[in-house]
Amino acid sequence: MSKWGHLAQTLTARKQQDLYRSRLTIDSPQAPRVMIEGREYLAFCSNDYLGLANDPRLIAAAQQALSEFGLGGGASHLVIGHHRAHHELELDLAEFTGRDRALLFSTGYMANLGVASALLGRGDYVIEDKLNHASLLDAGMLSGARLLRYRHADAEHLALRLDEVGDSRALVITDGVFSMDGDIAPLDAIAQVCHSKDAMLMVDDAHGFGVLGTEGGGCAAHFQMNQVQVPVLMGTLGKSYGAAGAFVAGSGELIETLVQFARTYIYTTSMPPAIAAAARVSLRISREETWRRERLNELVTRFRKEAIGMGYQLAASSTPIQPVFIGDAAAAMELSQALRKEGILITAIRPPTVPANTSRLRVTFSAAHTDDDLNQLLEVLHKYRGATNIAGVANA
């Protein structure tokens, strides 16, 4: 038997556990309604929170930049891949977030790995929320530092963890908005603990940037926290802002350290300049069109009231991420598939992405969703209320 025969066995086991992942291929732009294999579906599973992924103004900006800069970045930022569009976006992001400087990364995953590897090493500690995104946990494990975890959103437990590190350097990392639960980290309390214990705080605001704050400045803006209180701020441009890529914002010393030592920044090709140009327009739209966040709040408020009234168990979330807890992985998949037959796309989230017995439907809203869209979702959820097994779905 081949030494690699375990691959097939592992895949078979994953299927038997109802944890097998598969991809959908869409044939349309990202929007509330998408086309898959010739059928239109109403999607409540995108991270396009502000509804900008298919905005004609972003498309026009990208097209103009394509004619000016071409398509590819061509090289890493430190060789000849740092285009004017990148530089101007970094300036905009620094100003928007109230930080000295900002640095672009190709993805949020690479930004997180880059920060941890540049700031930490053997003898250091990285302390993370138990429910942090996988990229943050990977960043901690790969940094060379010792990884500790504290109870979810528990600043008191974080303080106890920091007491364990003694005089060693410690980087505390938390999501701003937790991607699978939608709740907001208590950044004010966490920042106070970090300050009192001389630890550096990093916030991954991938799902808060654009959604929270009057102009969409994210969790730091929501809590009115400056660069001293949140020294390392990471945000993404492919969710609320409808583009792609990510950034880290902070002091000049921090950013220059990343330029010199963050391997995921140094050893990769820059994002296409056209994406950076489109993201600049997206930032402006977010700041000016505050109705987009107001619309999200309207959708979330009504959804929560009516879904809870039907008997569904929701997470304690005020953000566009509204998980509907099912529990069993197979039951979550069955309900997701039943909704798809009704023309509604909602992804079933199962272990290991979430803890065992907490499988859920991850409902997400976009400012582009209409009242009729929400009505359709609620009607179908009403039909399947209480359906948590095969018989329940079949007989709903």
From Swiss-Prot:
This is 8-amino-7-oxononanoate synthase. Substrate binds at R21, H133, T353. The keyword Transferase applies. Pfam families: Aminotran_1_2. It catalyses: 6-carboxyhexanoyl-[ACP] + L-alanine + H(+) = (8S)-8-amino-7-oxononanoate + holo-[ACP] + CO2. InterPro entries: Aminotrans_II_pyridoxalP_BS (IPR001917), Aminotransferase_I/II_large (IPR004839), AON_synthase_class-II (IPR050087), AONS_Archaea/Proteobacteria (IPR004723), AONS_Proteobacteria (IPR022834), PyrdxlP-dep_Trfase (IPR015424), PyrdxlP-dep_Trfase_major (IPR015421), PyrdxlP-dep_Trfase_small (IPR015422). Catalyzes the decarboxylative condensation of pimeloyl-[acyl-carrier protein] and L-alanine to produce 8-amino-7-oxononanoate (AON), [acyl-carrier protein], and carbon dioxide. GO terms for molecular function: 8-amino-7-oxononanoate synthase activity; pyridoxal phosphate binding. It comes from Hahella chejuensis (strain KCTC 2396). The lineage of its organism: Bacteria, Pseudomonadati, Pseudomonadota, Gammaproteobacteria, Oceanospirillales.
